[in-house]
Swiss-Prot record:
This is TORTIFOLIA1-like protein 2. The keyword Repeat applies. Keywords: Repeat. InterPro entries: ARM-like, ARM-type_fold, TORTIFOLIA1/SINE1-2. One of its GO terms (molecular function) is microtubule binding. It comes from the Eukaryota. Pfam families: TOR1L1_C, TOR1L1_N.
């Protein structure tokens, strides 16, 4: 029986173990599948959701298995997988914060290893995860701060690594842990601060910006428990402001800003030095540094405390040498240099015998009066000194005032040979020191001293004698005490000179700093001006080279275009002659001695005007302008139409002709054209004298009229090239007809090289002789301008032609006004 029960028990245990292994295997398989989904962008979000769901419903006994899956990720995996494995540790701490305690050390070690990752996304995930662990595990802290030590110790050891990524990541993780911990142990973080300050002062340390942020977190967490530790930490920040690396300077300024933003009272003694350090790098060459420095200055100026620096060691040593009976903290605080409410130093003069109100007191100013103004050779001065103390020279120098009436009193007594001063003994002790030459028990009643002794010792400033101080009147016993005063004046003179020397050194230091700042600003301005000059020279050279290159390219374009158009013109003329010969036409175009050019648009295309030609009956080859205006008045109608739109070339030629004529009349017109051309050529060449009463302009216009009547566009283009622009030799009606045909060619982008000179002449003559010279009608001018502007907006194969049309349109728009 027992044997059977044992066999059954063993079988049950084996079955349970098998089930457990099966569950673990399924969990690992599920996690691995989800991690594989992270490697693909399309399935990344799905994998993240599955992993978070798995962590949320994870059983307590499966935590170890899950951690083994995410901690053993290979470095060859994609950055998304590595980042998500680190982030899942924080997710696990959020859902199961009570279960991850035993595995905390293993998790932190894995995070420290991941700090070497070259991808910044993975390192940022490490910093974020450490913050989550610190915030969630802080509630399980014991008296020995075991959780905090487990989080901090591996990271602090990693700061000493020689890898830059590890140093920076470990410092930032520590800063996040301290910021996320509700109560960081002060003893631990204080020791950390002392170590990190040494690291920050080490010139060979790499990750200084991260350590600066760590020190900032420690100080804000209360790690600077003593004044010396706080001073050393703040000094390290101030030294970092002078670092060559701008990220270090920016981190230091941000740290100073965040510390000053707390507004704690213990920052008061550090206010002056921090403001001075920030002011020195206020004009940093990097803008982010300048912005953070300006913001830090704003916060530090709001910190309670004095902006002036504490007394220097030199000043303190001078004072301590003459005040052995008192402690330095009581005698040489900043309040010693101010006139307190309870302290009153009263002077009485025998000359005025009047009381001066307290509001009228004015201390002597050392640089206001000229010593040469006091011409008295011997003064009788009676001084009453307090029984317990002697008036400090520093108190006299710092007692600024408003005593205009005292100046007037002294002006009335400048001619007196002797001046008497009395010091009234005071019962209350002033906050000033007692010199070694006079004991506290000495009761000085009166002193008679010659003015030469005061000048020799330096105790009495000539500026002091220029003002009279008055108070209560008292009769005192007079005793000569000149010898003791002479012994004491040398000591007082030394103290005065020492104080003035300290002030002078401070002012000189500030002046030197301001001069260096001005010099730096001047250097920056000079460098900027030189850079601007170099940039202008460089840009000018580039523009010149570009202009030369553009001119060469334009010349090349013109040459190629001329060759192409010349070849096209020869081809078009040959085709036109062949077509006309087949149709029985006797009109044949002739090539001029000049280069005849036409557009490539008329290739393999018969002229639309070759089949519809019109002639004009001419009784003579040369007609006067009067007969011309009478005979052509009806036929030369507005070629642009009443609506302001251009007609087709056929309509223009139809309006020019008076009617369709027979083929014989066309031949006759062709013969007339030939005869006129011969006459014009003979007249222009000088072989034949012009006919009496007929000018050369009439010959030119008659030839154009004959060509217009014939309807031969190739002959017209040849004539345009041969004569060139001669609009000044034609009547307004002929000009309108020619311009109408030229504008039709322009809109069709044909014969551009032939018509552009004529359009240029239109602009030039209108500029020279007025807008109404060629086209008196404003309506026709508007129509012509509209057509040219429309053509300027078209696409030209030749950029030079488009520029020429645009320039003509701009000139005419300035002359004739913008076309509506």
């Amino acid at each position: 029986m027992k044997t059977n029960m044992q066999v059954k028990g063993r079988g049950g245990n084996m079955k349970a173990n098998t089930n457990t292994q099966q569950v673990i295997f399924e969990l690992k398989k599920k996690v691995v599948i989800a991690l594989n989904k992270l490697a693909d962008r399309d399935t990344y979000q799905r994998g993240v959701d599955e992993l978070e769901k798995t962590v949320e419903h994870l059983a307590p006994d499966k935590v170890s298995c899950f951690l083994s899956c995410i901690l053993d990720t290979d470095s060859e995996q994609k950055s998304a997988v590595r980042k998500e494995c680190i982030r899942l540790m924080g997710t696990l701490a959020r859902f199961h914060e009570g279960l991850v305690g035993p595995y905390l050390g293993k998790m932190v070690s894995s995070i420290v290893k991941r700090l070497k990752d070259p991808d910044s996304v993975v390192r940022d995930a490490c910093i974020e995860t450490m913050g989550v662990l610190a915030s969630k595990m802080s509630c399980y802290e014991d008296q020995n701060f075991g959780v905090f030590v487990s989080l901090v110790k591996p990271l602090f050891e990693a700061i000493g690594d020689q890898n830059k990524y590890v140093q920076s990541g470990a410092a930032l993780c520590l800063a996040r842990v301290i910021d996320s911990s509700p109560e960081a142990p002060v003893a631990i973080i204080q020791r950390m601060l002392m170590r990190t300050v040494k690291l920050l002062n080490n010139s060979h340390f790499i990750a200084k910006p991260a350590v600066i942020e760590l020190n900032r977190s420690i100080i804000l967490a209360g790690g600077a428990t003593s004044k010396s530790v706080l001073s050393s930490a703040m000094s390290s920040f101030q030294d970092a402001l002078k670092n060559k690396d701008w990220t270090t300077r920016k981190a230091a300024s941000v740290a100073l800003m965040e510390i000053a933003a707390t507004g704690e009272k213990f920052l008061g003694p550090l206010k002056a030095s921090c403001i001075c350090s920030l002011e020195s790098c206020r004009f940093d060459k990097v803008k982010p540094v300048r912005d953070s420095v300006i913001l830090a200055l704003k916060y530090w100026k709001g910190v309670p405390g004095s902006d002036s620096p504490e007394p220097s060691e030199t000043e303190s040593s001078v004072k301590e040498s003459y005040n052995g009976a008192r402690e330095s903290s009581e005698l040489f605080s900043t309040s010693d240099f101010k006139v307190k409410d309870g302290m009153s130093i009263k002077y009485v003069t025998d000359v005025t015998r009047k009381k001066v109100p307290v509001s009228a007191r004015q201390p002597p100013t050392r640089y206001n009066d000229d010593p040469r103004k006091s011409n008295q050779d011997d003064w009788h001065i009676e001084i009453a000194v307090p029984e317990s103390s002697f008036v400090s020279k520093v108190d006299l120098y710092n007692e600024e005032s408003e005593g205009s009436c005292i100046t007037k009193t002294f002006a009335e007594t400048t001619n007196t040979p002797e001046v008497t001063y009395e010091y009234i003994p005071m019962k209350d002790k002033a906050d000033s020191y007692v010199t070694g030459g006079v004991n506290e028990n000495d009761d000085i009643k009166s002193i008679t001293v010659s003015s030469s002794s005061f000048r020799a010792s330096g105790m009495v400033n000539p500026a002091i004698t220029s003002k009279n101080y008055a108070a209560e009147e008292t009769d005192l016993e007079e005793q000569p005490f000149s010898t003791q005063v002479k012994d004491r004046t040398s000591l007082d003179s030394f103290v005065t000179v020492s104080s003035s020397q300290i002030n002078h050194d401070c002012c000189a230091k500030i002046a030197n700093e301001m001069a260096s700042v001005r010099k730096q600003l001047s250097d920056i301005e000079n460098k900027q001006s030189r850079l601007i000059d170099q940039l202008q020279v460089f840009s000018t050279g580039i523009m010149n080279n570009f202009s030369v290159l553009q001119s060469k390219v334009s010349s090349l374009e013109y040459a190629v275009e001329g060759i192409a158009q010349n070849a096209a013109l020869h081809s078009d003329i040959s085709n036109s002659n062949f077509v006309k010969h087949n149709q029985g036409s006797t009109i044949s175009p002739r090539l001029s001695s000049c280069t005849s050019r036409t557009s490539t648009d008329i290739r393999n295309r018969q002229s639309t005007l070759s089949t519809s030609k019109y002639s004009r009956e001419n009784k003579t080859h040369v007609r006067s302008r009067l007969n011309e205006s009478q005979g052509m008045e009806k036929t030369r109608s507005n070629p642009l139409g009443k609506t302001g739109q251009l007609h087709t070339r056929e309509d223009i030629w139809n309006n020019i002709g008076q009617g369709r004529q027979t083929l014989i009349q066309t031949r006759t017109s062709s013969d007339s054209i030939q005869s006129i051309r011969q006459q014009y050529a003979e007249v222009m060449s000088g072989t034949r004298k012009p006919v009496t009463g007929v000018s050369c302009e009439d010959v030119v216009e008659s030839e154009y009229l004959q060509v217009l009547s014939s309807g031969d566009e190739l002959a017209l283009v040849e004539l345009l090239d041969r004569t060139g622009p001669v609009l000044e030799s034609m009547s307004s009606q002929t000009i309108n007809e020619i311009l109408s045909i030229l504008l039709s060619y322009l809109l069709e982008r044909r014969f551009m090289n032939s018509i552009l000179p004529w359009l240029h002449q239109v602009a030039d003559l209108s500029t020279t002789n007025g807008a109404n010279y060629l086209i008196p009608s404003a309506r026709k001018r508007a129509q012509v301008l509209s057509a040219i502007q429309e053509a300027s907006g078209m696409d030209f194969s030749n950029l030079a032609e488009r520029r020429a049309v645009t320039q003509i349109a701009m000139k005419l728009r300035k002359l004739w006004g913008k076309c509506s």
